[in-house]
Amino acid sequence: MRLPPEWVERAEFLLRDAEGHLEEGVYWIVCFEAQQAAELYLKALILALTGLHPYTHDLVELLESLRDLGLEPPEELYAYADALTPHYTMSRYPGRKPVVYNRGLAERCLRYAREIARWVKEKAAEVQR
């Protein structure tokens, strides 16, 4: 199955942008961009399967939607999604919740987003066969 290219391009741009921000030390934006990239990848897969995408930023909900469509996301992806989801809001509103954005957290968020992207690409390739 072919993932919608404009969704994948935007997600890949965000991942590349996050890598640059990681090197610049702008850790809060890395976490936000990682969450957004993961969200775009998950929605791209749902869109490819159904022709529609959900209106949510909750990555766990998106994984549950994929499970309901017959795919089986591995358990660790749920943990990654749960860790990434709050950064959609927390990274954009300083002082809302006490989060210390540092390199370690930013690297984890980027790794989690890459793992979600990898899984989405694998699933799209499997469905194509």
Model features per residue range: what roles?
Residues M1-R129:
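Terminal alpha-helical segments
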